[in-house]
Structure formats: structure tokens, C-alpha cells
Swiss-Prot record:
Pfam name, any one: Imp-YgjV
Protein name, UniProt field: Uncharacterized protein HI_1736
Source organism: Haemophilus influenzae (strain ATCC 51907 / DSM 11121 / KW20 / Rd)
Entry keyword set: Cell membrane, Membrane, Transmembrane, Transmembrane helix
Superkingdom: Bacteria
Membrane topology classification: Multi-pass membrane protein
First-listed, main subcellular location of the protein, grouped into a coarse class: membrane
Transmembrane segments: 3-23, 35-55
InterPro entries with a match to the protein in the record: Uncharacterised_HI1736/YgjV
A Gene Ontology term for the protein's cellular component: plasma membrane
Location in or out of the cell: Cell membrane
Length: 77
């Protein structure tokens, strides 16, 4: 069996997204989920699955915004 980098990238994206839900900390969940979503964006652009890329790009933006919001809440305490 030959090594396929594109397929490996898809599996890594899946691993990060699935693993993110194992964290109790919402901060860690969002960081690991963002890594998976970024990998999915790259993977889906390579295989020209643009709806998947769009969804995961949106999720990255949501995760970054929520992490920023959590940081702002902690700074105001």
C-alpha cells in the first residue's frame, strides 16, 4: 500500500476534530477543534470539496471568536 499524503491529511483532520470532544476544558476543545478544522480546510481545498472547506473555515472563525471572548471575560474579572 502506497502512502497517500492527501488521505493522511484527511485522517489527521478527522482525528483532531474527534479528539477535541474528549477535552473537559472548553479552551482546549476549541483549540484542538480549530486545528482539525484548519486541516479539513486544506484537505477539502485539495480535493475540491468547497462546501466542506467553507463549513470548516466558518468553524475556525467561530472558535477563534469564542476563544477571544473567553479571554476578554477572564481579563475583566
Amino acid at each position: 500500500m502506497d502512502f497517500n499524503f492527501i488521505e493522511f491529511l484527511g485522517y489527521m483532520a478527522t482525528f483532531f476534530v474527534a479528539a477535541s470532544f474528549l477535552f473537559k476544558s472548553i479552551v482546549h476543545l476549541r483549540i484542538v477543534n480549530s486545528i482539525g478544522a484548519i486541516l479539513f480546510v486544506i484537505y477539502s481545498l485539495i480535493i475540491t470539496a468547497y462546501p466542506v472547506a467553507l463549513l470548516n473555515a466558518f468553524l475556525v472563525v467561530v472558535n477563534i471568536y469564542q476563544l477571544w471572548r473567553l479571554k476578554q471575560e477572564n481579563l475583566s474579572k
